[in-house]
């Protein structure tokens, strides 16, 4: 199994373009495709909060909840299921608009809605106190849930949460936010409103990985992105996709917290993680050498080991 994972990672690095982005877990496209059959037979469905969520459980003991990033789904955690489930009961689920869920779209989607879904899912599965591990937009979801239900968390692991509105109060952050919104976010939303999802993905990839990067993707890569495109549409057309998190509320969180960042991450995410470290001075912090925002996909072993080490102490 480990040799297979290593081969998949090698194939991933040989893709024409390694797409790293703010919420985009594209890096391990080939491996994610190969894992469909491996996990699909074990998927279950929970009807919660007016939607149906596909989820996968493995292992036993204290629950660890894995929350994927944007334009991704439960499959992006495939490399973590085996090592994590040796010690914990792992719950890996797809958020409401991500593959293979087929929920009707509702206006003004946000991480607040995702946090409500998470709470309802935990209630349905009778999980009281859990470890939360969130990546990118999934980390933003985890952080909102933590501020609303701190008593339910044993620990909180945040891999570069997209707290975009904090950039407004960080030196140099306004310029980064403006670039993000005007170059990619708003044009992608406009493309979705014109029913042009592939154009929206092309705009997104151009921003994060350079012009023409989408067109260099193999066919299976485009298909995988398209399988999760409904979430991207819901977010880029929302009136408030990045709700403001009150710094004082975050500062009062007392559960053990781990912050994970990539050494070569994007400027806005570096600014946000630095600010989060300042707001949560007791939080532990790990930097993954050589990694971008796609750290969990580029360096799954390093990310997994860092997280398991942290969980083992809490």
What are these regions (language model features)?
Residues 193-233:
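Conserved alpha/beta-hydrolase catalytic His-Asp/Glu region
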Residues 82, 91-137, 305:
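Active-site loop/oxyanion-hole signature of alpha/beta-hydrolase fold enzymes
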Residues 4-15, 19-64, 86-88, 312-314:
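Alpha/beta-hydrolase fold catalytic core
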Residues 153-189:
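Flexible "cap/lid" loop of the alpha/beta hydrolase fold
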Residues 51-107:
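Conserved HGGG/HGGXW glycine-rich cap/lid loop of the alpha/beta-hydrolase fold
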Residues 221-275:
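Conserved serine/cysteine hydrolase catalytic core
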Residues 128-167:
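Conserved hydrolase catalytic core segment
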